[in-house]
Amino acid sequence: MADLSFIEDTVAFPEKEEDEEEEEEGVEWGYEEGVEWGLVFPDANGEYQSPINLNSREARYDPSLLDVRLSPNYVVCRDCEVTNDGHTIQVILKSKSVLSGGPLPQGHEFELYEVRFHWGRENQRGSEHTVNFKAFPMELHLIHWNSTLFGSIDEAVGKPHGIAIIALFVQIGKEHVGLKAVTEILQDIQYKGKSKTIPCFNPNTLLPDPLLRDYWVYEGSLTIPPCSEGVTWILFRYPLTISQLQIEEFRRLRTHVKGAELVEGCDGILGDNFRPTQPLSDRVIRAAFQ
């Protein structure tokens, strides 16, 4: 199987024509039409798509991942905007937090742009990735872009070494104190298009392991349209814990604007916002632990 780790001679992803970009912009999409995304977003038909199922027995231990320690230099964000976009909850980070080391190109910094959440209507499902075909109730994505090579996240999307995403599985248990700043205001942004500024958010509270050694790595894509490839995925082995009350706050959110007339058969509840797992193809999943 081919090792798709960062290499110097990676083939560049083809640039989109201007009319193709215009066609994709503003297109409505939903998770009920997930299998049809490729009709409008051609990248969704790519060979190296995300999410995937992680088979822990087939993951290849790669000690080189520990040669340069994975190093998140995150700072507390002041006045962060939390938004319900009808597909997920986004926490937009304004402070400059960066990620480097580990599987990322040496000397490159990846700036943390946002945190996104994916969850199920029930605790038996919700995560985008699965581990040995087991799903978690929720998955968090810390989305970074390569600020060494590019001037913005828009420039970085779809480019080799452009995007790095830390994925964190979430299980039900004790309350997560670091996420209280978000869960406490979700009732104020129940409907699509609503947003609220929170005074303080610390992304460091989302990192489960101080040593940051137990993670898997593979090359994939964005899990939402346009599903562009060129994404390095870093998935931590040990999940975060949130309380049942906290996840229920997410399950009260809506996919529509307030007062909108719902189509028949749609209850408007925001949940099950995960893409089905995609074929691994010839990709190798690397592990930083044995």
Curated annotation (Swiss-Prot):
Compositionally biased intervals (Acidic residues): 16-26
Residues passing through the membrane, by range: none
Family stated for the protein in its record: Belongs to the alpha-carbonic anhydrase family.
Modification Phosphoserine occurs at: S5
CC annotations in GO: cytoplasm
Active site: H87
Record SMART domains: Carb_anhydrase
Alphabetical GO biological process terms: positive regulation of calcium-mediated signaling
Protein's name according to its UniProt entry: Carbonic anhydrase-related protein
Single GO molecular function: carbonate dehydratase activity
SUPFAM superfamilies associated with the record: Carbonic anhydrase (SSF51069)
One Pfam match: Carb_anhydrase
The species this protein was found in: Homo sapiens
Domain Alpha-carbonic anhydrase: 27-289
